[in-house]
Amino acid sequence: MKKLVPIEIGEEKRPKDIKAIQFRLASPEKILSWSHGEVKKPETINYRTLKPERDGLFCAKIFGPIKDYECLCGKYKKMRYKGVVCEKCGVEVTTSKVRRSRMGHIELVTPVAHIWYVNSLPSRIGTLLGVKMKDLERVLYYEAYIVKNPGEAYYDFEKKNPVKKYDVLNEEQYQQLVQHFGDTGFDARMGGEVVKELLEEFDLVEAFEQLREEMKNTNSEAKRKTIVKRLKVIESFLNSGNRPEWMMLTVVPVLPPDLRPLVALDGGKFAVSDVNDLYRRVINRNQRLKRLLELDAPEIIVRNEKRMLQEAVDALIDNGRRGNAVKGANKRPLKSLSEIIKGKQGRFRQNLLGKRVDFSGRSVIVVGPNLRMDQCGLPKLMALELFKPHLLAKLEEKGYATTLKQAKKMIEDRENVVWECLQEIVDEYPVLLNRAPTLHKLSIQAFHPVLIDGKAIQLHPLVCSAFNADFDGDQMAVHVPLTEEAIAECKILMLSSMNILLPASGRAIAVPTQDMVLGIYYLSKEKEDAKGTHKLFADINEVMTALESDYLDLNAKIRTKIDNQVIYTTAGRLIIKSILPDFVPVNLWNKVLKKKDIANLVDYVFKEGGPKITAEFLDNLKELGFKYSTVTGISISAYDIKVPDSKKRLIEEAKRKVKEIQQQFQAGLLTEQERYNKIIDIWTDTSNEVAKEMMELMKNDKDGFNSVYMMADSGARGSSAQIRQLAGMRGLMAKPDGTIIETPIISNFKEGLNVLEYFISTHGARKGLADTALKTANAGYLTRKLVDVAQNVKITMDDCGTHEGVEITDISVGNELIEPLEDRIFGRVLAQDIMDPITNEILFSEGTLLDEEKTRKIIEAGIKSVTIRTPITCKAEKGVCAKCYGLNMAEGKLVKPGEAVGIIAAQSIGEPGTQLTLRTFHVGGTASRSAEERQVVATKEGFIRYYNLKTYETEDGKIIVANRRNAAVLLVEPKIKALFNGEIEVKPIHDEVLITLSNGEEKVRYSFKKSDFARPNELAGVSGKIEGKLYLPYESGTKVEAGESIVEIIKEGWNIPNRIPYAAILKVKDGAPVTQKIVSGAKGVVKYYKLKGDYLERFEGVKEGEKIEEKGLFAVIADEEGREAARHYIARGSIIEVADDQSVDKDTVIAMPAKSDKTVIAEWDPYSIPIIAEKEGVITFEDIIPGVTAVEQVDEFTGETRLTINEYIPAEYKPAIVLAPKDGSEIIRYVLDPKTAIYVQNGQEVKLAQTLAKTPKAAAKSKDITGGLPRVSELFEARRPKDPAVVAEIDGVVSFGKPSRGKQRIIITADTGQTVEYLIDKNRQILVHNGEFVHAGERLTDGTVSGHDILRTLGEKALMYYMVSEIQQVYRRQGVNISDKHIEIIVSQMLRQVKIVDSGDTKFIPGDLVSKKEFRKENEKILRLGGQPAIAEPILIGITRAAVSSDSVISAASFQDTTKVLTEASVSAKVDHLEDLKENVIIGRLIPVGTGLYKDRKVKVETASQE
C-alpha cells in the first residue's frame, strides 16, 4: 500500500482518479479554508430584481456569478475577462458552475455542539469526558452547570465527598458551592463554551493510560463495559489525529447555493429548498446574539439566545434528532442536511447508486414469436430517437447532408434515406433490455434489434421466464451501450443466447413454456390404434411422405431404424428428432415429453453442444411447439372436466367415519385435540382419494387426449391441485388465523358451491392477494440486505491451497428427502480423495472438479458423504478462490477470477423470495396435514445392530426402548468378516484406525481413515449423517468367532429420540436380517460371492427360487470386460430370482424378500408420551389429590375411574408417581406434567415396563413453525429464537443440582472432571434425565436451537451445515432449486468477524468485534515483534449488522443507519480504499469485478474494424 497523500479538491484541479477517501472531522481552520466569504445576512434574492442579495445566502460575491462569464452588475461580460474581479460588485468573472462547489461560512458567536457527536449513540463528547448523555444535553442547552475546576469544593460539611471535575450541577447546588468555595478557585459553567474548553484541555494519552490501568484492576463486568466504550472513543481520536474540540462548531460551513436552489415557479412564487430556511434561522439567531452581547444584555436573555442558536444548528444538521422537528410553512418537518443523504430518497440511493441515463427509452412489450433467440423487435420511432447522434453522423458520412442542421431537418421530415441509414447502424449494434424489478442478472440482457413498425417492443417468448415477463401490459426499458468496450461486453457476455442457464442452479431457464410445451407434448404422445400403427419405415423422409399423404397418423406407434437399431417410436417424435443435434441419445427424446423432459433435453444439449447450438435448437423447438399447438387446436370445454362417480360414495364414507369419531369423543375416549386431528386426517385422505379417482378418470378419457388432462400433465398450464378444485372437491379451508375449518368444501367448481361454502372460500382468496403484496416488499428488502452483505465477495485467485473442507451428505428431514447428495456435490471441488467403498481404490483425488459424469459415478459407487471445499474454509485473503467456489453455474465451467460471486449469490437467494410463502404455520394449521409419524420402516437391506441400546421386555414379549438418548438402531451390511476365532484390537493412530484380529497363532490387520467411521455424536443424532459411514460392532478386547462381521457399513440409522421416541415398541431384534426387493444396478452377468475377511470369495451353485441362509452373500454384476459394474448385498431370508451366471438387464429383480410387507423397525403411539416403570416394584402417589391437582374421570366402556392431572397445578404441589423397586434399590420419581392420565392405582404392584401414565402430545406445547420467507430472514439475520433451546456445551453426564429461585439446575460433568451448569426456567420441558450421557451441541430443553449456540458448541462447519440445510428446506419445499454455494457465501460473510476474548499485546480491546482479516494481520505483526497474540472466538452476525459493519464506509453508509456510520467514520478518520462494488458505483468509477479488473492491468480492448 503506497503512502496516500491527501488532496484538496478545488474547482480547477479535479484529480483524474481517486485511490481512497478519508472521512475526518473538519477543524474551524479547515472550514475557513474551504470558504469563499462569510454569509452575514439571511436574505436570499431580491424579489424585485431577482438578483442575489450581497452577503446573503446566494451572494454572487461569495459563491460566484449567476451567468457564465458575467459579473452581477454587468460591467464585465465575455470570456476574455476570465478571472477578473469586478471592483463594483466584487464578483469574479468565471463559469457559473462554480456555484456548485464554492462554499461559504457563518462565524458563530458562541461554540455549539455538533448534534451527531452528542446524540448519536454512543455520544462521543459524553463518552470522552465521561459524562452521561442526558447530563451533557442539560449543560449544552443551558439547564445545568458542569464543573471545570473543582478548587477545594465539597458536597458535605464533613468534607468526605469532594466535587470532581466534570460533575454536573443544578442551579441550586451551583449557587451553594459558589457561595462557599467561590474563592478557592471553584469554577463551573454551562453551555457550549465550557464544553469546548474542557475538550481542549482533555489529555487523551493520559486518559488512555489511566483507563487501561483501571481495566486491569476492575472485576465488575458493568464497569469494564463502560471503560471499553471510553477506550474505543479515546483510541479513535488518538489514532486519527482528530482533536476532540473539533466536535464543537465555531464556524458553520454553508453549502454551495446550486445544491440548495431557489426555483422560480410560475406566478412569481419560489420553491425554496428546506436547507435555506434552516440556514436562515441560524444566521438570524447568530446576528441577534451578536447584538445582545454588544448591548450587554442580561445573562438570562443571552443564555436563551445561545440555547436557540444551538437548537438552530442542530436543526440544520439533523432536524428532529432532538426534541420536536422544525416545521415549515406547510406544517411538515424541514429536510435537514442529514435527511438529504439518508433513506431511499436520499443522495446515496437516489442519485449515486441509481441514476437515470441518457440513450434509453421504455415501451410496452408484445410477443415476437418469429424472432431469433438473440433478437428483439425495436419500434422504428424509438430507434430513431435512441440512435439520433449515430444517425446524424451517418447521414453526414454518407454525404446525404452537409451540415448538422440539414441532417436534423432530414430526420424531422422522416426522409427515406433516414430509415436506410438507421437500418445500417442497427445491424450488428446490440441494445440492452431491462425489466423492472431487476431481481437477478438475467433481468438485463442484450439483443440485436430488428426494426419494426408499431410502438411496442417485441420480446422473444423464451426469454420471458428470465425476465419474469408476460404480455398483459408489462413495460421494458431499452438502453444503448455507447463505448466500444460496452458493445463488446454486450455481444460476448450479455446476449440472450449466452444466458441460457440460471446462475442460481445451473439449470436451463430458456425453456419452452405454455403453448410450446403443449405442442411438443402432443407431438410426442402415442395414440392406441391410430392410422398406420406398427408399420415399418426406412427413414424420416418416408415418414414425412406418409404423413403428408394422410397414410399415417401423427401419434401412431411405428417402427423405424435409428443408429442401426430398429426402435418403436411415433411420427411426431421423429419430427422432434429432426431438429435435435445428432449427439442426443434415443432415450432422451423417444418418450412423452413433458415440461421437465424438455428442460432435461435443453440441459443435455447445452452440456454437450454449448450455447450456440443450444440457441439454435431452442428456436427450432419454439417454432415446432407453436406450430403444433396451433394445428392441434387443443381447447377446454366444461365437458372436459370430469367428476368421478365414486365421489358420492367416498364422501358418504368419510361422513360416517367422522360421526364415529364424534361419538368416541362424546364417550370421553378422545381429547378435543385428538378428535380435531382425526377429523382433519379423514377429510385430507378423502380429498386426496377423490382427486386420485378424478385424475384416473381424466387420464383414461379420450385415450389420454382429454384437453384439461393434457394441459396439466404436460406442465403447460394448471396443476392437479387446480383440476381437483374444478372436478374433485375443494377440500379443507383455513381460517384467517391459519387453523383449519373442520368441515370441508365438498362441492367443486363444476357443481358449484353453496352459499356457506362460497363464504368460507372468500377468506383464502382475499388472504392470497394481501399476502402477495406484502411478500414482494419483504423479498425485495431481503435481496437488498443480501446484496449489501455480499457485494464485496469476488473470485480473487485460482487456488488458495487449503486442504480443509466440509463433509456433506444429502439433506433430509425424517423420511422426506430435501436435497439429494448429487445436487449438493455437483460443480464442487473435492477436499479429500474419494475412495470406492467396495474396492478401496481412489475414485477421484483431492482437487477434482465434479462434473455430472463424475457426480454420477460417486452416487453409483454408493458413497453417502463427500468432503468438498467451500467458501467458508477458503483461505484467500480477500474474496474466495475459484477452487473453493467450484463451477460457475451460469456457464457450466470453473469460475474465472474477477467473477462477482457475492452479488450472484445474493440475487440467487433473493430472486425466488417472491415465490416463498409468508405465513407462519400453526401445528394443525395447514390445509394439507401429513398424518402423524407413528413408525419407522426400513428401506434398504442388511441386518440390524443396536448401538448403545437398552431395552425392557414386557410380560407379553414386547421389546421396549429404555434409552432416552445417545442410542440408535442401525441397519448395516458386512464390510469385513473375522477369518478365524480371535480377539479384536482397535487402535487409532493419527488420522487412521488400525483393526487387528489375533489368536496367538494367526494375526490380520486392516486400516481405515478415521473420518470413514461414524462418530459417537453422529450416531446419537446430534450432528451430521451416518449413512455410508463405517461402524465397529465390537469394542477393543472383544473375542469374536469366525464369520462374525467386525466392520460394517451403515445403510440406515434411526437414532433415539429424534427418529424413535423413548418407550417405542421395537419390532426387530439385534442381528436380525432385513430383506428387500433387490434390483440390478447395471447390465451384465450375475455372479454370487461370499465375504471372507475383507475380500469376496466365489460362491457357486445359487439357484433360482432358493432361500438364502448364508451370511455375507453378495451378488456382483460383471460387465462385458468382466469388471464389477454393481454389487448388491443379499440378506439372509431373501429368495433368489436370478441364478448364478445368468445375464440380466439394468433394473432386473435379482432377489425378493421372504415376506411381502415392509419391515417395520419400531412403532409408537403418536398422540401421547408414555411413562413406564423402569423396574418391578410398588407405586405410591405424591401430591396427586383428586379435586386439587387431579380430577377423576370414569371410563364409560370399562367403568374404571382414572385420575387425570389438572391443566393448572397450584404452585406448592408437584404431582409425581413414586416407584419403590422390589430389589431395594433407590426409589424412582416420575414427575407428572399437566393433563397426564394415570393408568395405575396408589399402592399397586407393577411389572417391568408397565405403562404408568400417558401425557397427551398436544400438551407438549404446540409451537408455531415459521416457514417461508420469515424463516429465511430469521436465519440470515441470525435472530435468537424467542425461547431457544438450552444446548450442552461439552460432552458429559447429566445430573441435577439443587434448584435456585424456582429454576432447575442441570450440571454436565465431562470425563475430565470439567463441569458446566445451566439454570432452566421451570416452565420449560427438560429433555434429559439424570445420569444420561449428552454430546456437545445436544438440546437439553425444548425450543429451537439457535445458530449462535451451534457455532459456540460445534464450530463453523456445523453451523454452515445447519444454515444450508435449514434454508434449503424452505426453498426446496417450494420447488426452488438453489445451489448450496450461494448460501455458503452469505454464511461466510456472516462469520467474517471475531470477538476478542483476550487482547494479549495487540491494540484490540476485549469485547471488540474485528474482521478476521484485521485480526490475522495484527496478530502476525505482534508475533513478529515477539509479543503475545490476541485470542478471539468466532461469532455469527446477522446480515443487516454485517452490512452496516462493512469495512467500506461509503458502502455501509449507503445501506442503512447513514448518520451513525458517518459519525463513527469521521471520529476515527476511517479510510475507504474503494475496493468493492458499491463504493465504486457511488464514486462513478468502473467496478472492480469481471472485465473491470483489467482496468488496473492496462489491458487495451482492441475492436476488430467491422468490414
UniProtKB/Swiss-Prot annotation:
One of its GO terms (biological process) is DNA-templated transcription. It catalyses: RNA(n) + a ribonucleoside 5'-triphosphate = RNA(n+1) + diphosphate. Its cofactor is Mg(2+); Zn(2+). GO terms for molecular function: DNA binding; DNA-directed RNA polymerase activity; magnesium ion binding; zinc ion binding. This is DNA-directed RNA polymerase subunit beta'. Zn(2+) 1 binds at residues 71, 73, 86, 89. The RNAP catalytic core consists of 2 alpha, 1 beta, 1 beta' and 1 omega subunit. When a sigma factor is associated with the core the holoenzyme is formed, which can initiate transcription. InterPro entries: DNA-dir_RpoC_beta_prime (IPR045867), DNA-dir_RpoC_beta_prime_bact (IPR012754), RNA_pol_asu (IPR000722), RNA_pol_N (IPR006592), RNA_pol_Rpb1_1 (IPR007080), RNA_pol_Rpb1_3 (IPR007066), RNA_pol_Rpb1_3_sf (IPR042102), RNA_pol_Rpb1_4 (IPR007083). It comes from Nitratiruptor sp. (strain SB155-2). It is an enzyme of class 2 (transferase). PANTHER family: DNA-DIRECTED RNA POLYMERASE, DNA-DIRECTED RNA POLYMERASE SUBUNIT BETA.
